[in-house]
Amino acid sequence: MPWKYFDVMSMNSDQPLLKTTIKVDDIISLRSRSKVTRCVGVLILIAMVLWSVKVTIFEDTDWERMGSIGQVLTSAGRFMGIDFSLVPNLLVPAIETFMISCLGTLLGVIICVPATWFGARNITPFKPITYPIGRLLMSISRSIHEIVWALFFVAVLGLGALPGIFAIAVRSVGFIAKMSAEAIENVELGPADAIRATGANNFQVLLFAILPQVLPQVLGIILFEWEINIRRSAILGLVGAGGLGLVFFRQMNTFNHHGVTTVIIAILGIIMIGEVISHYTRNRVI
């Protein structure tokens, strides 16, 4: 049986027109290998999913302690109610939670200024040294969970809102600085070159040429992180960092199930208020 061929014409900017002959059987062979590779990949993925289900659901779950479906529903039913006597005592922790997120985000933005300056490739003052330092600060902030930061600051500063503020601030640096640095790296360099030609240093270039271009985008990043920080600040109280999370922890320890539900509703209310404020601010400023 004669071979079937395709004539493939290729053009290179540095070379004249070339003509290459490819066998049809070679194309079929390549496609078959690609299908085999995909099938093997799918089988590996299915095996990993089945193994994960086996380990997490069947081996690590205490089914005897969980009981029947009726017992599970009975346990869940204990939380169906509100402790109205607790409501007046939630105002101060709710305000504290809100202020932890605000002050933590503000402090994080302040810390982000040098981290962003160092971590943006096109404005970093001394690239071989400052650029790795800036990127390292971002990586450390993002790689450590806010609960771990809160535990660290509680151990250093004691219980209260202050450890929560510092934990929120340090955790915010990674996201805000990284996204801001990437926005700065994509700006038009014409205004920066013009200001630099007048003798301005890198910080002045950042302040007067770069920042006006990226300010709307940076404000959007900060508002987005602030929304997340409201959720974080509500949870940090579980490790003693103040706010509604601390009240939640106490209700759990005293087995006040209706109190737990009341605190959860308060947390949801704070989050929704934060979303409304963020949406309104974004529409007015950005």
Question: Over which residues does each language-model region extend?
Answer:
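Membrane-cytosol interface at the C-terminal ends of specific transmembrane alpha-helices
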Residues: 159-225, 276
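N-terminal, non-cleaved signal-anchor transmembrane helix
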Residues: 2-106, 113-114, 118, 122, ...
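C-terminal transmembrane helix and the adjacent membrane-cytosol boundary/short C-terminal tail
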Residues: 220, 261-286
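Cytoplasmic-entry segments and transmembrane alpha-helices of multi-pass inner-membrane transporters
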Residues: 115-150, 179-182
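Hydrophobic positions within alpha-helical transmembrane segments of bacterial inner-membrane proteins
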Residues: 105-113, 117, 121, 147, ...
